[in-house]
Amino acid sequence: MTPFTQHTGLVAPLDRANVDTDQIIPKQFLKSIKRTGFGPNLFDEWRYLDIGEPGRDNSTRPLNPEFVLNFPRYQGASVLLARENFGCGSSREHAPWALDEYGFRTVIAPSFADIFYNNSFKNGLLPIVLAEAQVDALFEQCLATEGYQLTVDLAAQRVRRPDGVEYGFDIDAFRKHCLLNGLDDIGLTLQDADAIGRFEQGHRARQPWLFGALQ
């Protein structure tokens, strides 16, 4: 998992509340258990004018000119600005996978659905909760300023606007540690690889009959 320390990126404003996981990545794309291949179908039903199908070449599909991520000014955005209850609906880890593969490093909103919030941390996507008035101010500036960027400093737990105004945000210490060091569940486990190896050797010595049956 890519470490998250400090990130400055172009902001895309998704001015919709209660965006659910089926809108983030529609159900027909969930057949794959791989973590890749979902970015092109992020917000599929909003980005395109037709119905998407797995394996289809998206480069030939008609884009919805009214959807924010299709606006030329937001191409290359890596910070998603959203409204309350982002990521509600069914539990699907594919949602943060799709956001991450599209290029988003962080999502800023007044609130998130609990399961999506937890899944995001496990997949290197930083969900930031700010006060609604602060999010309103960011939307106002973003919509008024082409090329609007924000800087997110995870170590300091601050979001910095171009005018120097900063907003603090809360994050669990363990989740912060994992993001700063690029540790997902597998990475955390591998930190104890030596101890696990010693346990397996001892277990094999104590109960060799168990391992003999597997040979």
Curated annotation (Swiss-Prot):
Keywords: Amino-acid biosynthesis, Branched-chain amino acid biosynthesis, Leucine biosynthesis, Lyase
One of the record's GO cellular component terms: 3-isopropylmalate dehydratase complex
Signal peptide: none
Stored Pfam families: Aconitase_C
Reactions performed catalytically: (2R,3S)-3-isopropylmalate = (2S)-2-isopropylmalate
Pathway(s) the chain acts in: Amino-acid biosynthesis; L-leucine biosynthesis; L-leucine from 3-methyl-2-oxobutanoate: step 2/4
Top class in the EC scheme: lyase
Top-rank taxon, per record: Bacteria
GO BP term (any one): L-leucine biosynthetic process
EC number: 4.2.1.33
UniProt-recorded Gene Ontology molecular function terms: 3-isopropylmalate dehydratase activity
PANTHER family: 3-ISOPROPYLMALATE DEHYDRATASE SMALL SUBUNIT, 3-ISOPROPYLMALATE DEHYDRATASE SMALL SUBUNIT 2-RELATED-RELATED
Function: Catalyzes the isomerization between 2-isopropylmalate and 3-isopropylmalate, via the formation of 2-isopropylmaleate.
Cited HAMAP family: LeuD_type1
Oligomer status and interactors: Heterodimer of LeuC and LeuD.
NCBIfam families to which the protein is assigned, alphabetical: leuD (TIGR00171), PRK01641.1 (NF002458)
Family statement: Belongs to the LeuD family. LeuD type 1 subfamily.
Protein name: 3-isopropylmalate dehydratase small subunit
Source organism per UniProt: Xanthomonas euvesicatoria pv. vesicatoria (strain 85-10) (Xanthomonas campestris pv. vesicatoria)
